[in-house]
A protein has these predicted regions:
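Alpha/beta-hydrolase fold catalytic core
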Residues: 1-74, 96-98, 133, 137, ...
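Flexible "cap/lid" loop of the alpha/beta hydrolase fold
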Residues: 155, 159-160, 164-205
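Active-site loop/oxyanion-hole signature of alpha/beta-hydrolase fold enzymes
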Residues: 55, 63-64, 101-145, 161, ...
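Conserved HGGG/HGGXW glycine-rich cap/lid loop of the alpha/beta-hydrolase fold
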Residues: 64-110
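Catalytic active-site module of serine/aspartate enzymes centered on a nucleophile-bearing elbow/loop
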Residues: 3-4, 295-337
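Short beta-strand/loop motif that positions the catalytic acidic residue
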Residues: 266, 272-274, 278
Length: 337
């Protein structure tokens, strides 16, 4: 082989090897950094832009795509200990001309965390209302989506600020009394009885506990490498003290059944999406909401757990779009009549 040709292959091989070795080193040595880069890249690929806005001295962090148009804007509220990027799997399947806003909930990720703040469900709903006013999202009624803790907040928000919300999607929301005890609720009861409340299953501090949490939250069994589990834990550990405080706040008597206490006040057309195999919040909550909210549409997803957004992103996105089309069509018919 000609020496110049051989040198070309060596140089090309070396050029390819450098990013591969960098990736392997990051995977083995800095998995948490790799996870952050992953979210950064995914946001860019989907066209989501990150912005900050302040209400007095309180800062909100959010991502958005598109501009307000003839269809309602969509505001998405994530669950306990998550962040705005958890919605990216659904954003992938939503039209680019829809105006989407994903906000970090109070105390999470880039939104202000303060020991003096009120992290009860009603307190969080007030903060989200401040955010909505800051970005003037409520110039027109918008579609509100929330999952788990975010679903609890979304339902309370729709009840307390009905003029802001034209329609509502609640994905396996918290805030309802349990008619059937889920695996998670049973674990909590056992921890309370043994006085080991610090070992909350949703607040892992080791890769093994992270694997257990993923099994609890998901019906689909994802094969997650040990290093990624370690990275997921490393990202969360600095925040675990806050997560414990927040968890005790939202399961306190003031917030535990907030959605149940407010569901009869919800006037907006409402969509309920729930995984049939949810082990965190029992699926029986769907029928409870359906019996209290006048215009309520329930969708139970087979072979799906609590992490609906991760397990069934395409289906969830399609259900939201179909529901919006139904509500939008109904509104147009009323105007024409």
């Amino acid at each position: 082989m000609d020496l110049d040709v051989l040198n070309m292959f060596v140089i090309a091989g070396g050029t390819l090897a450098i990013p591969i070795l960098a990736f392997v080193a990051s995977f083995l040595l800095w998995p948490a950094a790799l996870i952050r880069i992953y979210y950064w890249y995914w946001r860019r690929a989907l066209g989501m832009q990150v912005r900050y806005v302040s209400y007095d001295d309180y800062q909100f962090c959010y991502s958005y795509r598109g501009r307000p148009g003839y269809r309602p804007s969509i505001l998405m509220l994530h669950g306990f200990s998550a962040h705005k990027d958890m919605w990216l799997s659904i954003v992938k399947f939503l039209p680019k001309n829809l105006h989407l806003v994903c906000v970090d909930m109070p105390g999470h990720e880039g939104t202000t965390r303060s020991d003096l703040d009120d992290y009860s469900i009603s307190g969080q709903a007030k903060r989200i209302h401040q955010f909505v006013e800051c970005i003037r999202l409520n110039r027109r009624p918008f579609h509100l989506v929330g999952t788990s803790m975010g679903g609890n907040v979304a339902g309370v928000y729709a009840a307390q600020y009905p003029e802001d919300v034209c329609s509502l999607t609640l994905i396996c929301p918290a805030g309802l009394p349990s008619t059937t005890e889920s695996k998670f609720v049973k674990q909590l009861r056992e921890l309370q009885e043994s006085r080991c409340i610090d070992r909350i299953p949703l607040i892992p501090s080791t890769p093994e506990e992270m694997a257990d949490m993923l099994k609890l939250c998901s019906y689909v069994r994802f094969k997650v490498p040990q290093q990624i589990l370690q990275g997921l834990v490393d990202v969360r550990i600095p925040h675990n003290d806050f997560y414990r405080k927040l968890f005790l706040e939202i399961v306190d008597e003031k917030s535990r059944h907030s959605l149940h206490e407010n569901m009869s006040k919800i006037k907006a057309p409402t969509q309920i999406i729930w995984g049939k195999q949810d082990q965190v919040l029992d699926v029986s909550g769907a029928s409870m909401l359906a019996s209290a909210i006048p215009d309520c549409h329930v969708y139970i997803l087979e072979n799906c757990g609590h992490s609906v957004v991760v397990e069934r992103p395409r289906k969830t996105a399609n259900l939201i779009l179909e529901f919006l089309a139904l509500v939008h069509s109904s509104d147009n018919n009323k105007k024409q009549a």
